[in-house]
From Swiss-Prot:
Pfam families for this protein: EF_TS
Protein's name in the database: Elongation factor Ts
Superkingdom: Bacteria
PROSITE patterns referenced in this protein's UniProt entry, alphabetically: EF_TS_1, EF_TS_2
Single GO cellular component term: cytoplasm
Protein family (similarity comment): Belongs to the EF-Ts family.
UniProt cross-references to InterPro entries, sorted A to Z: EF-Ts_dimer_sf (IPR036402), Transl_elong_EFTs/EF1B (IPR001816), Transl_elong_EFTs/EF1B_dimer (IPR014039), Transl_elong_Ts_CS (IPR018101), UBA-like_sf (IPR009060)
Cellular location(s): Cytoplasm
Keywords from the UniProt entry: Cytoplasm, Elongation factor, Protein biosynthesis
Originating species: Psychrobacter arcticus (strain DSM 17307 / VKM B-2377 / 273-4)
GO molecular function: translation elongation factor activity
HAMAP family attached to this UniProt entry: EF_Ts (MF_00050)
Broad class of where this protein is predominantly found: cytoplasm
């Protein structure tokens, strides 16, 4: 069989269909003897291998996507390794598509979402692998949160923070401002009763330990603990926080005046709980120089 000459037109077609670099496309076409479809199959196979290698890299950047239906909203976090890729239109298009697929199918389990149809005869997982091949970074669908309610306000701060809040009464503007407040102040609960018992107990232990270090009498220590817990609850409960639109007022007072009741909220921030690798550039240079001197 004679070898087919790879033309610029063939390379362009493969680039358009895969998004890969010119030299990668040229090499793939040479290996497939000019057959574009075979080249694509081979690249997908190598892409899966490449994706497996990339999976070990820490994906601590990314985007929060909000997909809203009539009575529910989905928050989806999709991670990549750098903020440069987080802003890439291919990455954001993938993340937005996955969020809408999750909403349409009412699926909140990440593993189950991966198996859903994505389009172009691909599953979500296959589309993710293809994107890893194209972009060259580890990309992961990390988590999904869903909130149901008749009135849901949503707010996204850049790509990094997403909030949805369910409420009764008031206006759409009030709901939007409430979502903005939650994005900015990151409450852990609506009110005191909603704060998790283990979280409150842990905070009390910390406050008590610090209070007892003062060496003051027990009755004073008890007052210090009481004051410390009150301050903590003012910081972490939505209704006790100072309102983002008017810090002279508490959120609870503003909502009461407007006849608004908060039923629930969800807030996601990119990379929460992920330990990002810190690069020591000076150490890297020193190690490189040491190797060069051997």
């Amino acid at each position: 069989m004679s070898e087919v000459k790879v033309s610029a037109k063939m390379v362009k077609e493969l680039r358009d269909r895969t998004g890969l670099g010119m030299m990668e496309c040229k090499k793939a076409l040479e290996e497939s003897n000019g057959d574009v479809e075979t080249a694509i199959d081979n690249l997908r196979k190598s892409g899966q291998a490449k994706a497996a290698k990339k999976a070990g890299n820490i994906a601590a950047d990314g985007a929060i996507i909000i997909a809203q239906g009539e009575s529910k909203a989905f928050l989806l976090e999709v991670n990549c390794q750098t903020d440069f890729v987080a802003k890439d239109e291919n990455f954001t298009a993938f993340a937005e598509t996955v969020a809408n697929i999750a909403l349409e199918n009412n699926v909140t389990d990440v593993a189950a979402i991966a198996e859903l149809p994505y389009g172009n005869d691909q599953t979500v997982e296959e589309a993710r692998v293809s994107l890893v091949q194209k972009i060259g970074e580890n990309i992961q669908i990390r988590r999904v949160e869903v909130l149901e309610g008749a009135n849901i306000a949503a707010y996204r701060h850049g790509l990094r923070i997403g909030v949805v809040v369910s409420y009764e009464g008031g206006s759409a503007e009030t709901g939007k401002n409430l979502a903005m407040h939650i994005a900015a102040f990151n409450p852990v609960a609506i009110d005191d009763e909603d704060v998790a018992a283990d979280l409150l107990a842990r905070e009390k232990d910390i406050i008590e330990a610090k209070a007892r270090e003062s060496g003051k009498p027990d009755n004073i220590v008890e007052k210090m603990i009481e004051g410390g817990l009150r301050k903590y609850l003012e910081e972490v409960t939505l209704l006790r926080q100072s309102y983002v639109m008017d810090n002279e007022k508490k959120v609870g007072d503003v909502l009461k005046a407007e006849g608004v009741k908060v039923l629930g909220f969800k807030r996601l921030e990119v990379g929460e709980g992920i330990e990002k690798k810190q690069e020591d550039f000076a150490a890297e240079v020193a190690a490189t120089q040491a190797l060069a001197n051997k």
